[in-house]
Protein backbone atom coordinates (compact mmCIF):
# COMPACT_ATOMS: atom_id res chain seq x y z
CA UNK A 1 0.00 0.00 0.00
CA UNK A 2 2.78 2.45 0.96
CA UNK A 3 4.73 1.75 -2.24
CA UNK A 4 1.65 1.83 -4.49
CA UNK A 5 0.47 5.15 -3.08
CA UNK A 6 3.89 6.71 -3.57
CA UNK A 7 4.16 5.43 -7.13
CA UNK A 8 0.76 6.87 -8.03
CA UNK A 9 1.61 10.28 -6.59
CA UNK A 10 4.99 10.49 -8.32
CA UNK A 11 3.62 9.34 -11.69
CA UNK A 12 0.96 12.04 -11.57
CA UNK A 13 3.55 14.60 -10.48
CA UNK A 14 5.67 13.75 -13.53
CA UNK A 15 2.65 14.08 -15.82
CA UNK A 16 1.95 17.56 -14.44
CA UNK A 17 5.54 18.78 -14.17
CA UNK A 18 5.49 19.07 -10.38
CA UNK A 19 8.75 18.64 -8.49
CA UNK A 20 7.35 18.56 -4.94
CA UNK A 21 4.10 18.25 -3.01
CA UNK A 22 3.69 19.94 0.37
CA UNK A 23 0.80 18.27 2.20
CA UNK A 24 -0.82 19.52 5.41
CA UNK A 25 -4.24 17.88 5.32
CA UNK A 26 -4.41 14.88 7.64
CA UNK A 27 -5.95 12.60 5.03
CA UNK A 28 -3.39 13.55 2.40
CA UNK A 29 -0.48 12.99 4.80
CA UNK A 30 -1.87 9.57 5.73
CA UNK A 31 -2.12 8.65 2.04
CA UNK A 32 1.38 9.84 1.14
CA UNK A 33 3.26 8.49 4.18
CA UNK A 34 1.25 5.65 5.73
CA UNK A 35 1.46 7.43 9.09
CA UNK A 36 -1.57 7.23 11.39
CA UNK A 37 -2.05 8.61 14.87
CA UNK A 38 -4.70 8.45 17.61
CA UNK A 39 -7.19 11.27 17.83
CA UNK A 40 -10.24 11.55 20.06
CA UNK A 41 -11.52 15.01 19.11
CA UNK A 42 -11.64 15.53 15.35
CA UNK A 43 -12.00 19.25 15.97
CA UNK A 44 -8.36 19.26 17.08
CA UNK A 45 -7.05 17.54 13.95
CA UNK A 46 -5.11 20.66 12.99
CA UNK A 47 -3.18 20.69 16.28
CA UNK A 48 0.29 19.13 16.15
CA UNK A 49 -0.46 17.73 12.73
CA UNK A 50 2.21 16.07 10.61
CA UNK A 51 3.37 17.59 7.33
CA UNK A 52 4.58 15.63 4.30
CA UNK A 53 6.88 16.65 1.46
CA UNK A 54 6.79 14.33 -1.55
CA UNK A 55 9.56 14.66 -4.15
CA UNK A 56 9.07 13.44 -7.69
CA UNK A 57 12.46 11.67 -7.79
CA UNK A 58 12.51 10.19 -4.26
CA UNK A 59 10.73 6.87 -3.54
CA UNK A 60 10.12 7.93 0.07
CA UNK A 61 8.30 11.02 1.36
CA UNK A 62 9.71 13.30 4.02
CA UNK A 63 7.45 13.56 7.06
CA UNK A 64 7.64 16.19 9.78
CA UNK A 65 5.99 14.29 12.59
CA UNK A 66 5.05 15.11 16.18
CA UNK A 67 5.40 11.56 17.52
CA UNK A 68 2.96 11.75 20.37
CA UNK A 69 2.32 8.84 22.69
CA UNK A 70 0.46 6.12 20.83
CA UNK A 71 1.40 7.35 17.36
CA UNK A 72 2.17 4.74 14.77
CA UNK A 73 5.79 3.75 15.38
CA UNK A 74 5.88 1.19 12.55
CA UNK A 75 6.74 3.67 9.84
CA UNK A 76 7.87 2.54 6.42
CA UNK A 77 9.36 5.99 5.94
CA UNK A 78 13.16 5.69 6.44
CA UNK A 79 14.56 7.26 9.59
CA UNK A 80 16.49 9.87 7.61
CA UNK A 81 13.18 11.06 6.09
CA UNK A 82 11.47 11.59 9.48
CA UNK A 83 11.98 15.08 10.89
CA UNK A 84 10.85 17.13 13.91
CA UNK A 85 7.40 18.70 13.64
CA UNK A 86 6.57 21.90 11.80
CA UNK A 87 4.00 24.27 13.26
CA UNK A 88 2.99 26.10 10.12
CA UNK A 89 0.47 28.39 11.79
CA UNK A 90 3.50 30.23 13.19
CA UNK A 91 6.24 32.20 11.43
CA UNK A 92 8.95 30.12 13.11
CA UNK A 93 7.53 26.91 11.67
CA UNK A 94 7.29 28.45 8.21
CA UNK A 95 10.93 29.54 8.42
CA UNK A 96 11.89 25.92 9.14
CA UNK A 97 9.81 24.74 6.17
CA UNK A 98 11.51 27.34 3.99
CA UNK A 99 14.93 25.93 4.89
CA UNK A 100 13.73 22.35 4.35
CA UNK A 101 12.30 23.10 0.90
CA UNK A 102 15.47 24.94 -0.11
CA UNK A 103 17.43 21.77 0.71
CA UNK A 104 14.98 19.31 -0.87
CA UNK A 105 13.47 20.95 -3.97
CA UNK A 106 15.68 21.59 -7.02
CA UNK A 107 16.06 25.24 -8.02
CA UNK A 108 13.15 26.27 -10.21
CA UNK A 109 11.13 23.19 -9.32
CA UNK A 110 7.35 23.62 -9.34
CA UNK A 111 5.59 23.00 -6.03
CA UNK A 112 1.97 22.08 -5.29
CA UNK A 113 0.30 22.43 -1.87
CA UNK A 114 -3.02 21.25 -0.48
CA UNK A 115 -3.51 24.23 1.85
CA UNK A 116 -1.77 27.38 3.02
CA UNK A 117 -1.84 28.76 6.54
CA UNK A 118 -1.83 32.50 7.12
CA UNK A 119 1.85 32.39 8.01
CA UNK A 120 2.61 30.47 4.81
CA UNK A 121 0.75 33.05 2.73
CA UNK A 122 2.78 35.87 4.28
CA UNK A 123 5.99 34.06 3.34
CA UNK A 124 4.78 32.67 0.02
CA UNK A 125 7.41 34.40 -2.12
CA UNK A 126 10.21 32.97 0.03
CA UNK A 127 8.69 29.51 0.38
CA UNK A 128 8.06 29.11 -3.34
CA UNK A 129 10.71 31.14 -5.24
CA UNK A 130 9.84 29.43 -8.55
CA UNK A 131 6.37 30.97 -8.46
CA UNK A 132 3.01 30.53 -6.76
CA UNK A 133 2.26 26.91 -5.88
CA UNK A 134 -0.42 24.98 -7.71
CA UNK A 135 -3.21 22.98 -6.09
CA UNK A 136 -2.06 19.55 -4.91
CA UNK A 137 -5.62 18.26 -5.39
CA UNK A 138 -4.81 17.77 -9.09
CA UNK A 139 -2.34 15.07 -7.99
CA UNK A 140 -3.74 13.72 -4.73
CA UNK A 141 -7.36 13.47 -5.87
CA UNK A 142 -6.76 11.18 -8.88
CA UNK A 143 -4.19 9.14 -6.93
CA UNK A 144 -6.66 8.41 -4.12
CA UNK A 145 -9.58 7.56 -6.40
CA UNK A 146 -8.94 3.84 -7.00
CA UNK A 147 -8.34 1.89 -3.81
CA UNK A 148 -5.74 -0.84 -3.38
CA UNK A 149 -6.84 -4.17 -1.84
CA UNK A 150 -5.12 -3.14 1.41
CA UNK A 151 -7.04 0.14 1.50
CA UNK A 152 -10.36 -1.62 0.91
CA UNK A 153 -9.48 -4.02 3.74
CA UNK A 154 -8.73 -1.13 6.12
CA UNK A 155 -12.01 0.60 5.24
CA UNK A 156 -13.92 -2.65 5.72
CA UNK A 157 -12.28 -3.11 9.14
CA UNK A 158 -13.15 0.48 10.08
CA UNK A 159 -16.76 -0.21 9.10
CA UNK A 160 -16.93 -3.39 11.19
CA UNK A 161 -15.60 -1.51 14.24
CA UNK A 162 -18.11 1.28 13.66
CA UNK A 163 -21.04 -1.08 13.20
CA UNK A 164 -20.26 -3.08 16.34
CA UNK A 165 -19.97 0.10 18.40
CA UNK A 166 -23.14 1.53 16.82
CA UNK A 167 -25.07 -1.64 17.67
CA UNK A 168 -24.32 -1.11 21.36
CA UNK A 169 -25.43 2.52 21.10
CA UNK A 170 -28.67 1.56 19.38
CA UNK A 171 -29.48 -0.95 22.11
CA UNK A 172 -29.08 1.82 24.69
CA UNK A 173 -31.68 4.13 23.11
CA UNK A 174 -34.36 5.02 25.64
CA UNK A 175 -36.27 8.06 26.86
CA UNK A 176 -34.07 10.15 29.15
CA UNK A 177 -30.76 9.16 27.57
CA UNK A 178 -28.79 12.22 26.45
CA UNK A 179 -27.23 12.68 23.02
CA UNK A 180 -23.81 13.12 24.66
CA UNK A 181 -24.30 9.77 26.43
CA UNK A 182 -24.63 8.13 23.02
CA UNK A 183 -21.42 9.82 21.85
CA UNK A 184 -19.50 8.71 24.94
CA UNK A 185 -20.65 5.11 24.56
CA UNK A 186 -19.82 5.05 20.85
CA UNK A 187 -16.33 6.53 21.16
CA UNK A 188 -15.38 4.36 24.12
CA UNK A 189 -16.45 1.16 22.38
CA UNK A 190 -14.91 2.11 19.04
CA UNK A 191 -11.49 2.62 20.61
CA UNK A 192 -11.83 -0.61 22.59
CA UNK A 193 -12.42 -2.38 19.27
CA UNK A 194 -9.29 -0.92 17.67
CA UNK A 195 -10.23 2.44 16.14
CA UNK A 196 -7.26 4.70 15.44
CA UNK A 197 -9.06 8.04 15.38
CA UNK A 198 -12.49 9.60 15.78
CA UNK A 199 -13.15 11.43 12.52
CA UNK A 200 -16.14 13.59 13.37
CA UNK A 201 -18.27 14.65 16.29
CA UNK A 202 -20.91 11.92 16.36
CA UNK A 203 -24.31 13.04 15.07
CA UNK A 204 -27.50 11.76 16.75
CA UNK A 205 -29.80 14.43 15.37
CA UNK A 206 -33.40 14.51 16.58
CA UNK A 207 -35.42 15.39 13.49
CA UNK A 208 -38.24 17.96 13.54
CA UNK A 209 -41.80 17.00 12.69
CA UNK A 210 -41.89 19.48 9.78
CA UNK A 211 -39.29 21.23 7.65
CA UNK A 212 -40.11 24.60 9.19
CA UNK A 213 -40.34 23.50 12.83
CA UNK A 214 -36.66 22.86 13.41
CA UNK A 215 -36.01 26.45 14.54
CA UNK A 216 -32.72 26.49 12.61
CA UNK A 217 -32.37 28.89 9.69
CA UNK A 218 -30.62 27.62 6.55
CA UNK A 219 -29.71 29.47 3.36
CA UNK A 220 -31.57 26.86 1.31
CA UNK A 221 -34.73 26.90 3.42
CA UNK A 222 -34.37 23.15 3.80
CA UNK A 223 -33.56 20.86 6.72
CA UNK A 224 -30.53 21.70 8.84
CA UNK A 225 -28.09 18.80 8.96
CA UNK A 226 -25.89 18.15 10.83
CA UNK A 227 -26.63 19.83 14.14
CA UNK A 228 -24.23 19.54 17.06
CA UNK A 229 -24.81 16.88 19.69
CA UNK A 230 -25.92 18.36 23.03
CA UNK A 231 -27.11 17.26 26.46
CA UNK A 232 -30.65 17.03 25.10
CA UNK A 233 -32.56 14.10 26.59
CA UNK A 234 -34.27 11.78 24.13
CA UNK A 235 -38.04 11.38 24.17
CA UNK A 236 -40.12 8.36 23.25
CA UNK A 237 -40.81 8.47 19.50
CA UNK A 238 -37.88 10.76 18.62
CA UNK A 239 -36.53 10.09 15.13
CA UNK A 240 -32.71 10.19 15.04
CA UNK A 241 -30.59 10.64 11.94
CA UNK A 242 -27.18 9.24 12.85
CA UNK A 243 -23.79 9.86 11.24
CA UNK A 244 -20.44 8.71 12.67
CA UNK A 245 -16.96 8.02 11.31
CA UNK A 246 -13.74 6.57 12.73
CA UNK A 247 -10.47 5.45 11.15
CA UNK A 248 -8.55 2.22 11.20
CA UNK A 249 -4.87 2.67 10.28
CA UNK A 250 -5.80 5.99 8.73
CA UNK A 251 -8.75 4.80 6.59
CA UNK A 252 -12.31 5.89 7.32
CA UNK A 253 -15.67 4.37 7.96
CA UNK A 254 -18.92 6.23 7.32
CA UNK A 255 -22.05 5.08 9.12
CA UNK A 256 -25.55 6.46 8.86
CA UNK A 257 -28.91 5.04 9.89
CA UNK A 258 -32.28 6.35 11.04
CA UNK A 259 -33.42 5.15 14.47
CA UNK A 260 -36.58 5.66 16.52
CA UNK A 261 -36.53 5.91 20.31
CA UNK A 262 -38.85 3.17 21.52
CA UNK A 263 -38.68 1.31 18.17
CA UNK A 264 -42.34 1.97 17.35
CA UNK A 265 -42.48 2.82 13.65
CA UNK A 266 -45.73 4.03 12.05
CA UNK A 267 -47.03 2.90 8.68
CA UNK A 268 -46.09 6.29 7.21
CA UNK A 269 -42.55 5.91 8.53
CA UNK A 270 -42.27 2.40 7.09
CA UNK A 271 -43.44 3.86 3.78
CA UNK A 272 -40.65 6.45 3.98
CA UNK A 273 -38.09 3.68 4.37
CA UNK A 274 -39.59 1.68 1.50
CA UNK A 275 -39.34 4.70 -0.81
CA UNK A 276 -35.73 5.24 0.33
CA UNK A 277 -34.97 1.60 -0.45
CA UNK A 278 -36.52 1.93 -3.92
CA UNK A 279 -34.29 4.94 -4.59
CA UNK A 280 -31.18 3.13 -3.37
CA UNK A 281 -32.01 0.05 -5.47
CA UNK A 282 -32.49 2.22 -8.56
CA UNK A 283 -29.11 3.87 -7.99
CA UNK A 284 -27.35 0.55 -7.37
CA UNK A 285 -28.87 -0.87 -10.57
CA UNK A 286 -26.78 1.56 -12.65
CA UNK A 287 -23.68 1.50 -10.42
CA UNK A 288 -20.66 -0.07 -12.13
CA UNK A 289 -17.36 0.82 -13.76
CA UNK A 290 -18.01 3.13 -16.72
CA UNK A 291 -21.08 4.72 -15.16
CA UNK A 292 -21.03 8.43 -14.35
CA UNK A 293 -22.14 10.51 -11.40
CA UNK A 294 -24.86 11.83 -13.69
CA UNK A 295 -26.18 8.31 -14.33
CA UNK A 296 -26.65 7.75 -10.59
CA UNK A 297 -28.21 11.18 -10.01
CA UNK A 298 -30.75 10.67 -12.80
CA UNK A 299 -31.64 7.20 -11.52
CA UNK A 300 -32.24 8.60 -8.03
CA UNK A 301 -34.38 11.49 -9.29
CA UNK A 302 -36.48 9.21 -11.49
CA UNK A 303 -37.09 6.80 -8.61
CA UNK A 304 -38.18 9.74 -6.45
CA UNK A 305 -40.81 10.98 -8.87
CA UNK A 306 -38.69 13.68 -10.48
CA UNK A 307 -37.26 15.46 -7.43
CA UNK A 308 -33.79 15.18 -5.94
CA UNK A 309 -33.68 12.75 -2.98
CA UNK A 310 -30.87 14.53 -1.18
CA UNK A 311 -30.45 17.76 0.77
CA UNK A 312 -29.50 20.77 -1.39
CA UNK A 313 -26.36 21.55 0.64
CA UNK A 314 -25.18 17.93 0.47
CA UNK A 315 -25.05 15.23 -2.18
CA UNK A 316 -26.46 11.89 -3.27
CA UNK A 317 -23.12 10.24 -2.60
CA UNK A 318 -19.38 10.71 -2.23
CA UNK A 319 -16.07 8.88 -2.23
CA UNK A 320 -14.29 7.66 0.89
CA UNK A 321 -10.72 6.80 1.88
CA UNK A 322 -8.35 8.65 4.18
CA UNK A 323 -11.12 11.25 4.46
CA UNK A 324 -14.71 10.41 5.31
CA UNK A 325 -15.88 12.33 2.23
CA UNK A 326 -13.72 12.45 -0.90
CA UNK A 327 -14.32 13.02 -4.59
CA UNK A 328 -16.48 12.38 -6.44
CA UNK A 329 -19.41 14.16 -4.85
CA UNK A 330 -22.62 13.45 -6.75
CA UNK A 331 -25.31 16.06 -7.31
CA UNK A 332 -23.57 19.14 -5.91
CA UNK A 333 -23.44 22.68 -7.25
CA UNK A 334 -20.46 21.60 -9.37
CA UNK A 335 -23.26 20.99 -11.86
CA UNK A 336 -24.55 18.42 -14.31
CA UNK A 337 -21.57 18.76 -16.65
CA UNK A 338 -19.19 17.69 -13.88
CA UNK A 339 -21.46 14.77 -12.95
CA UNK A 340 -21.75 13.57 -16.55
CA UNK A 341 -17.99 13.75 -17.14
CA UNK A 342 -16.94 11.88 -14.00
CA UNK A 343 -16.63 8.23 -15.05
CA UNK A 344 -16.31 5.57 -12.36
CA UNK A 345 -13.22 3.33 -12.52
CA UNK A 346 -13.24 -0.17 -11.06
CA UNK A 347 -11.86 -0.09 -7.52
CA UNK A 348 -13.36 3.26 -6.59
CA UNK A 349 -15.38 3.35 -3.36
CA UNK A 350 -18.64 5.22 -3.01
CA UNK A 351 -20.93 6.16 -0.11
CA UNK A 352 -24.58 6.50 -1.16
CA UNK A 353 -26.85 8.49 1.15
CA UNK A 354 -30.23 9.41 -0.36
CA UNK A 355 -32.74 11.22 1.83
CA UNK A 356 -36.54 11.12 1.81
CA UNK A 357 -38.75 13.48 3.74
CA UNK A 358 -42.43 13.87 4.51
CA UNK A 359 -43.68 16.19 7.24
CA UNK A 360 -44.84 14.27 10.27
CA UNK A 361 -42.51 11.28 9.79
CA UNK A 362 -39.04 12.52 10.68
CA UNK A 363 -37.89 11.42 7.23
CA UNK A 364 -35.41 8.67 6.44
CA UNK A 365 -31.68 8.70 5.72
CA UNK A 366 -29.10 5.90 5.67
CA UNK A 367 -25.65 5.38 4.16
CA UNK A 368 -24.35 2.45 2.12
CA UNK A 369 -20.69 1.95 1.12
CA UNK A 370 -19.86 0.02 -2.05
CA UNK A 371 -16.76 -0.82 -4.09
CA UNK A 372 -17.19 -0.28 -7.83
CA UNK A 373 -16.49 -3.40 -9.92
CA UNK A 374 -16.38 -3.99 -13.68
CA UNK A 375 -19.92 -5.38 -13.74
CA UNK A 376 -21.50 -3.74 -10.70
CA UNK A 377 -20.52 -3.24 -7.09
CA UNK A 378 -19.59 -5.02 -3.88
CA UNK A 379 -21.27 -3.94 -0.64
CA UNK A 380 -19.14 -3.01 2.37
CA UNK A 381 -21.86 -1.84 4.78
CA UNK A 382 -23.35 -4.68 6.84
CA UNK A 383 -25.85 -3.23 9.31
CA UNK A 384 -29.62 -3.75 9.61
CA UNK A 385 -32.22 -1.03 9.05
CA UNK A 386 -34.24 -1.90 12.18
CA UNK A 387 -36.63 -0.71 13.41
CA UNK A 388 -37.61 0.19 9.84
CA UNK A 389 -38.83 -2.39 7.33
CA UNK A 390 -42.08 -4.33 7.62
CA UNK A 391 -40.35 -7.61 6.75
Predicted regions and their residues:
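Active-site neighborhoods and metal-handling regions in enzymes and metal-associated proteins
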Residues: 1-391
Amino acid sequence: MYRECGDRLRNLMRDRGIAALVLLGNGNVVYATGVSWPLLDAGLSHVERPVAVVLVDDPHPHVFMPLREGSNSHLEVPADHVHPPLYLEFDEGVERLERALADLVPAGGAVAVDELTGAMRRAQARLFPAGPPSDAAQVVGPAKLVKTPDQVSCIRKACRITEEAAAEVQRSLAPGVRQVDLSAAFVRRAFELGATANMLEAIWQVMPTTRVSGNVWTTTGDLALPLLTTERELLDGDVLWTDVSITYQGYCSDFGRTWVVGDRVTDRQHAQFERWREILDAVLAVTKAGATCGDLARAAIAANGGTKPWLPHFYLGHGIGTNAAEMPMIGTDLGAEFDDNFVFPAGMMLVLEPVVWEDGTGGYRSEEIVVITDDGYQSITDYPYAPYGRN
